[in-house]
């Protein structure tokens, strides 16, 4: 057999062929570990994830080698094409012979190509294709049997697994008629009888760890990403563009007639103060005020400039808040699965506490939002989310006086609607602690 190792396309194809052989070794090792995984300290889930990661790496290397194979073929054809249209001196004799024999396309005929090389390439390509197809079926029915039994797709791309891959760990447990504590107790008792408690503990630990990390990452994204995007949008796009358009492309100064009226009131106040200063200076100090009109003019221009900046800020803040809401809505839609996981994790974390701690955290959250000291917190919160309005005390007072009332009604409905059905003892403890808190506040007010 001729030495084809120096041909670049054949070298890439051979590399993909060797990786395909390595895939078969990984599958054999997985089947051997699967039979003895419960008798060793290694978890079956870790073996599954390790095998899946190794297979995905092999698939990526195979596709990368096949891509190199196609690129090498393309460059070989390109070099052959350029060689026949601009041949070296040593190839002119061969080109003349090919034209004499009647090859009008000026290319190498197929009978001059080694048939053994073609058969070898076709055999390896067929073997790689069969290996990848068999790997997809094997992953579906052996590596992830639970996903195939439910009739769900493992992934959108059958080989690369780049989208929609379902993990072997179930990250969300739906709430049914029976409480999950009862079903888990039955599962643990069954695992103890079958001597499978260790894999069950590892599974629950992996479930809790994945839920916590996923929930914290999602909450961090909900807090940071909309704020960063809206801030960058305001600083580098909306405010400079709106300021340029407002000052150069249109002649209006005031955004609304109310701003014009306020500016006139300020100018009148400035004139009255200036006249008062002039009268005081002439009557008591005996001095003549110089440049009174210039001072009034400068202060008037400063007042108009401030109103102009307020109008620009209103438009810029409105666009920024719209971008913030769009980004936040996009995160909610794109992270629907993460939202379900976060909901499940929060429920598990809350229901795992004692009744006293549950009532304590409920009181802490309600007092922070609707307690006697909450208006200061709401004033700070409304100053961050302005909804296009410039900071105004009347708007903040209106928000503080209405939104906590609505939130208080919703919280009371949730407490009496859900907690009474799930755990009446929590409601009783909550009422007791709430009465003690109210009694303490009344005594404090009487002493004052």
UniProtKB/Swiss-Prot annotation:
Annotated InterPro entries: CemA (IPR004282)
Topology in the lipid bilayer: Multi-pass membrane protein
Main localisation: plastid
PANTHER family recorded: CHLOROPLAST ENVELOPE MEMBRANE PROTEIN, CHLOROPLAST ENVELOPE MEMBRANE PROTEIN-RELATED
Reaction equations catalysed: K(+)(in) + H(+)(out) = K(+)(out) + H(+)(in)
One annotated GO molecular function: antiporter activity
Name listed for the protein in its UniProt record: Potassium/proton antiporter CemA
Swiss-Prot/TrEMBL GO biological process terms: potassium ion transport; proton transmembrane transport
Highest taxon in the source lineage: Eukaryota
CC per GO annotation: plastid membrane
Pfam hit, one: CemA
Protein family according to the UniProt entry: Belongs to the CemA family.
Provenance organism: Aneura mirabilis (Parasitic liverwort)
Coiled-coil residues: none
Swiss-Prot/TrEMBL keywords: Antiport, Hydrogen ion transport, Ion transport, Membrane, Plastid, Potassium, Potassium transport, Transmembrane, Transmembrane helix, Transport
Segments crossing the lipid bilayer: 47-67, 213-233, 314-334, 395-415
Cell compartments where the protein resides: Plastid membrane
Keyword Ion transport annotated: yes
Function in brief: May be involved in proton extrusion.
